[in-house]
């Protein structure tokens, strides 16, 4: 039997051939998944990605905002759904913090706030949510900037004993003050902003730090424990404030040496005390974005290792998109295509490092991203204590379609969820399990005006609610324009009893099942109904599918659909 690593390597190197590449070019048209994290790191350090204009006047603030809008519009066109925004840069922030100073990337001056009530972080959060994108606050954990930076000097004033290396100043992970301090910063962000995640970067011992002495308090295990304690403090703070906020980090791309593949003495666990797979197992992380900026056997075996040790959490492969630039590595585009394709084959999302190399369309990477992500996708859902998400309901006109003319169609609904997904299809009921039927993901309103191409005849619509944990409700299907064939498959009910077709009753099923359109069984009904009806008391409003299991049959038979609207 082939190992997962062997299969991955076979997939990767097969895709080098021209024939396999032709197949891969068509891949997005029929394999774009409904749930997948598609992310980009948006770097504010040294103004690398954004902003390019300092917010020193009303006009410049508007330019800074427009730069951000342009980037987000490019992401949206490529169906990217997650933005990792560098929020704590180097012991300095891009928001008004009560703990640390302003980073100079916003106004050009350390410690100087922008005027005119402008809050860059709030602006990015709002603009991301307008586009249905998740926004994660990227926190650079250990770096404190240069020795003379304002952030580093303020840390010294607070009693931190920084370590100074050739690359700058760093917090000491062994310092007992560090876990609570970083937790306070993350708590401040989560408490004051509607972010969807906290993303920890450089949550490890820095490069260039002396090796463990082996004496008490400074062994490899001690160092791993110190980093894990920092992660735990941040996790506990964040989840206590908003349990739906996703915890993630960007670990070194190789966790440890593998049986047949060496990390070449540079890995997270043994070299830098970063036990990220253990954080998944303990529930301290919801996602990992390993920085896999490698090729060939330095990439694919380690990708498989991340997937095999994800402990029912989520892995998002960090792609070294910057290597497409001749000044950085001069990779060929096919290398990145292969990595993205193989990651998707394995059910793994992808994240581009970093934004400028994607949006500048190096070697056509943005064009490929748009093809690869043929349809919108939802992020992976978190587990929550809430059993079901309340479905949306009709407005007073008892239908989704409020008005339509030759140019537009207006949909409207009611509900209590923060976001909604809109689906469209030529078949009824709309199958919400198919990514190609999704028109909008995580739409924040309750009314939508559609223009071309969704105003043609014979297009049907459905709405689902999505909660803060990214769990989805059953669908609210439109009622006004179902075809005759669709009506014939609809089963009559009054919200209490469901009427079965007489011919179905005669076949004497062993039992019936009621399923959501996602295929989840929500109720099993007796195969010996009273007359030709069965009870459906207590089913929430929405569209359902009825199936029957007959004697001597291995598979359930579709009976029809019914709609509950109490």
For each feature predicted by the language model, list its residue ranges.
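Short, surface-exposed loop/turn motifs with a glycine/proline- and acidic-biased composition
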Residues: 455, 526-552
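Active-site-adjacent "subsite" loops/lids of carbohydrate-active enzymes
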Residues: 34-37, 43-65, 136-188, 192
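Beta-strand-rich modules
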Residues: 450-471
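C-terminal tail/sorting-segment detector
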Residues: 482-485, 543-566
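Catalytic domains of carbohydrate-active enzymes, especially glycoside hydrolases
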Residues: 63-92, 192-195
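Substrate-binding cleft of secreted/luminal carbohydrate-active enzymes
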Residues: 276-277, 281-299, 316-387
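Pro/Thr/Ser/Gly-rich low-complexity, intrinsically disordered linker/stalk tracts
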Residues: 374-416, 470-487
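Polysaccharide-binding and catalytic clefts of secreted carbohydrate-active enzymes
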Residues: 80-81, 88, 131, 153-278, ...
């Amino acid at each position: 039997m082939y190992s997962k690593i062997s299969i991955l390597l076979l997939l990767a190197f097969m895709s080098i051939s021209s024939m396999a590449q032709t197949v891969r070019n068509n891949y997005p048209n029929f394999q774009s998944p409904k749930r997948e994290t598609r992310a980009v790191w948006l770097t504010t350090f040294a103004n690398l990605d954004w902003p390019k204009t300092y917010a020193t006047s009303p006009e410049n603030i508007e330019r800074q905002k427009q730069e951000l809008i342009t980037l987000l519009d490019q992401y949206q066109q490529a169906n990217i759904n997650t933005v990792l925004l560098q929020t704590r840069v180097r012991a300095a922030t891009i928001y008004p913090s009560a703990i640390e100073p302003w980073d100079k990337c916003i106004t050009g001056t350390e410690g100087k706030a922008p005027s005119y009530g402008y809050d860059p972080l709030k602006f990015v959060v709002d603009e991301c949510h307008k586009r249905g994108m998740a926004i994660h606050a990227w926190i650079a954990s250990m770096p404190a900037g240069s020795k003379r930076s304002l952030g580093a000097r303020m840390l010294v004033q607070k009693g931190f004993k920084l370590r100074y290396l050739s690359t700058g100043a760093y917090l000491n992970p062994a310092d007992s003050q560090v876990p609570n301090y970083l937790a306070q910063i993350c708590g401040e962000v989560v408490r004051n902003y509607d972010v969807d995640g906290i993303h920890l970067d450089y949550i490890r011992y820095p490069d260039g730090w002396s090796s463990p002495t082996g004496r008490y308090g400074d062994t490899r295990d001690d160092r791993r424990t110190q980093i894990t304690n920092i992660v735990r403090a941040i996790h506990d703070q964040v989840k206590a404030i908003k349990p739906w906020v996703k915890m993630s980090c960007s670990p070194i791309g190789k966790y440890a040496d593998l049986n047949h593949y060496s990390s070449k003495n540079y890995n997270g666990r043994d070299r830098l005390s970063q036990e990220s797979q253990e954080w998944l197992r303990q529930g301290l992380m919801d996602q990992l974005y390993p920085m896999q900026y490698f090729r060939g056997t330095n990439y694919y075996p380690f990708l498989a290792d991340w997937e095999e040790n994800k402990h029912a959490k989520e892995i998002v492969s960090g792609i070294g998109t910057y290597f497409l630039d001749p000044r950085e590595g001069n990779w060929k585009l096919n290398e990145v295509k292969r990595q993205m394709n193989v990651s998707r084959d394995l059910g793994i999302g992808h994240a581009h490092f970093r934004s400028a190399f994607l949006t500048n369309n190096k070697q056509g990477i943005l064009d490929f991203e748009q093809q690869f992500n043929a349809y919108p996708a939802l992020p992976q859902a978190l587990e929550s204590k809430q059993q079901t998400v309340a479905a949306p309901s009709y407005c007073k006109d008892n239908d989704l379609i409020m008005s339509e003319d030759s140019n537009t169609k207006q949909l409207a609904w009611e509900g209590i969820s923060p976001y909604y997904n809109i689906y469209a299809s030529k078949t009824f009921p709309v199958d919400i399990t198919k990514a190609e039927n999704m028109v909008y993901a995580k739409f924040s309103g309750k009314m939508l005006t559609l223009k071309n191409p969704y105003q043609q005849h014979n297009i049907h619509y459905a709405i689902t609610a999505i909660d803060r944990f990214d769990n989805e409700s059953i669908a609210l299907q439109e009622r006004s324009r179902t075809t005759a064939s669709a009506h014939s498959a609809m089963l009559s009910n009054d919200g209490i009893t469901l009427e079965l077709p007489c011919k179905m009753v005669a076949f004497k099923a062993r039992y019936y099942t009621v399923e959501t359109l996602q295929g989840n069984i929500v109720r099993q009904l007796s195969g010996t109904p009273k007359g030709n009806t069965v009870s459906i008391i207590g089913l929430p409003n929405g569209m359902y599918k009825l199936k029957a299991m007959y004697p001597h049959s291995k598979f359930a038979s579709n009976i029809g659909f019914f709609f509950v609207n109490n």
